[in-house]
Regions:
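Conserved N-terminal segment of class I S-adenosyl-L-methionine
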Residues: 1-159, 169-172, 239-243, 248-256, ...
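Short N-terminal helix/helix-N-cap motif within the alpha/beta-hydrolase-1
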Residues: 166-170, 197
Length: 288
């Protein structure tokens, strides 16, 4: 039984049996811990703290984007959708896709606009209702509770979901069940092995539960590969991108500008070496 002080996560979410060890990185919730086998980093947040920060997502006004921010988001979505179609070797109209943890359904909307047969699943009731109010086919609840048929989707997406999960393996196992043989699972999350994380340490915004509610589990390319294998997926590729060293709001203008120039110069090396702070894992359900 968890006490208020007991960490919500007590074992490696990837499935390793190695004892977790404290690191030197101290967050508001306590020291980050590391799995000695896969390098996964884990928050020391209690269940109460986790639930407190997760509450921000169940708000009908959450995650509204407009203007240039929405334009950039749509461009990213179109690029990802084009790659999904390319990996599947199908036209969008022949692809059934589900965005799991879809929030307001922005990616669902982008997929529908591109001709995909797209829908979403979102556990937060208010935000799921906001998506439906916008005319999007979004179900409320967990993927595991939807009772989808076996092998019914060509592609699934999990954008900024796995870092919230104490035990992600059941979700990935369900993803494998509902995907068709050869289907694609696309996962996005932060990269705890990035140059950004190494440089910023405890200042990395991805570690900040007050800013990014419920972030308790921090992946790296190796731990993502192990999780994928444990769930029965084949890794097509793992991409990382972007470097940053400072937060704009907490850094003097001159220092921020210099750091941004250096970060931009390192974007390509970070991408090539797997050290960018955004991670995108392209997984495939085996054809047999």
């Amino acid at each position: 039984m968890n006490t208020p002080e007991t960490p919500y996560v007590t074992t490696c979410p990837v499935g390793c049996t190695t004892t977790l060890a404290d690191t030197a990185l101290r967050l508001r919730e306590g020291l980050l811990r590391r799995c000695g086998s896969c390098g996964q980093l884990l928050s020391s947040a209690s269940a109460a703290r986790y639930n407190e920060t997760m509450a921000q997502f169940d708000d009908s006004a959450f995650n509204i984007t407009t203007g240039s921010a929405q334009t950039r988001r749509d461009a990213v979505a179109r690029k990802r959708l084009a790659r999904i179609a390319g990996l599947l070797g199908k036209l969008p109209r022949d692809i059934r896709l589900c965005d799991v943890g879809c929030s307001r359904g922005q990616f669902v909307a982008a997929a529908v606009a591109e001709g995909f047969g797209a829908e979403g699943v979102e556990p937060a009731p208010q935000i799921a209702q906001a998506a439906r109010d916008a005319g999007l086919p979004v179900r409320t609840g967990l993927l595991e509770d939807q009772q989808y048929a076996d092998s019914c989707f060509d592609a699934l997406t999990l954008f900024e979901v796995v870092e919230h999960l104490r035990t992600p393996l059941p979700l990935l196992t369900e993803c494998r069940r509902v995907l068709k043989p050869g289907g694609i699972l696309l996962i996005s999350t932060g990269n705890a092995a990035s140059w950004t994380a190494a440089t910023m340490g405890a200042r990395w915004d991805y570690f900040d539960m007050a800013r990014d509610g419920g972030h308790i589990s921090f992946f790296n390319p190796r731990s993502m590969e192990i999780l994928a294998a444990n769930a029965g997926f084949v890794v097509e590729r793992i991409d990382t991108s972007r470097v940053k060293f400072h937060d704009r709001e907490n850094t003097p203008r001159g220092r921020y500008a210099a750091g941004k120039l250096l970060a931009e110069a390192l974007n390509l090396p970070a991408r090539l070496l797997g050290r960018g702070h955004d991670m995108l894992a392209w997984l495939r359900k085996p054809a047999q």
